Structure formats: C-alpha cells, structure tokens
Amino acid sequence: NASMTVFRKSKYHLIDKDFTAMHYCGDWLFWIKMAEKGDVAILHKRLNRFRRHSQSVTVQIDRKEKQLAEKLIIFTYLWDKLILNGFQLTLSKGYVYKEIIRTNMEESRKKQTLANMRKYGVTKKCYYLERIIKTLCQILHIKLRL
C-alpha cells in the first residue's frame, strides 16, 4: 500500500508512462520505475491493516488471465534489469510459476505461458523452493525480508 508514499514530482516526469496502459499491475511498474530514479527508504513497520475476504473484488480478479499477463510484464522487467539478487530471483520465479498454474485459463494456454517463461528460468524447482520457504516462514512465525 503506497498511500503514504512521497516522491519528487521532477522524478515522475523522467519515467516512461507505459504503466498507465495497465489495468491491474500498473502501480507495480510505476513504483519500480520511480525507485530506479533515486534512493528509496523503507520503514519495516506495518502502518495500516487490511485483509481480503473470498468475496472481495481483489480476490475475484486475482486469477484472471489479464492480470497474470501484466504480472509477467512486471517480473520480466525486473529480471531483465537484474534488480533482484539470486535468492530473490529464484523465489520470484517460483511465485510466477505458482501464479501461472493457479490462473483459471485453458490448459493449452497455461502450458504455452509456462513454456514462454522457461527462457527466464521459471521452473517447477523454483516453485517448490518458493513454497517451502513460505511454509517454513509460516511455521517459524517469521517474515521473510528480502
């Protein structure tokens, strides 16, 4: 949630505005591009609280194919820019694998999407590692900070 985020307007004018064409993940791309323009300070403190219930619009939309396509744009952008370290990279690829297999779409399109993402190293091994790390963090009651 970026409701309390502050950035310099001059930096906004320096970024490409392709995020405005995205309907689901444009804010992700916006914040990535803004972060590339300067220093970022992070406060590791939960400042607001919200939860999603199964009937919320966010949960219903979450599995749609269009949103998946936008997420793939975001992740391939991050991977191409080499913004993530090796561990983050592997976990993010596991997350992408999970998103693809859980998205409600035709099996043939799902297989094609997975095949397309293999060139980025998105594999079932990455998926298993991401799931194991998430489960361990839940069992140990720790928040993974990458």
Regions found by a protein language model. Name each.
Residues 15-17, 76, 128-131:
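A general secondary-structure boundary signal
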Residues 40-41, 93, 110-112:
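Short hydrophobic/aromatic segments of transmembrane alpha-helices and their interfaces
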